[in-house]
Amino acid sequence: MKLLVVEDDHLLNNTLCYNLSAAGYTVDAAVTKKAAVSFCEAQDYDLIVLDVNLPDGNGFDLCEKIKERRPDTAVIFLTANDME
């Protein structure tokens, strides 16, 4: 299973990639919307773990763009935002 982690917090990105790789998944990592788009244009992913807030854009907009090209790709959103 091929995964893409899109998270601008380097510690969280590295932790997710390490644990997912240790669980046997093939994992790529991006820290910006632009990098994620490049990865998605180059290959297919079974699952994308996507931060809601990225330094160069919005995770929801990125999800829409990904789903236009590959509607079957599963997406899990992450955020450090609270409800307050």
Regions flagged by a language model, labelled:
Residues 1-84:
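N-terminal/domain-start alpha-helical segments
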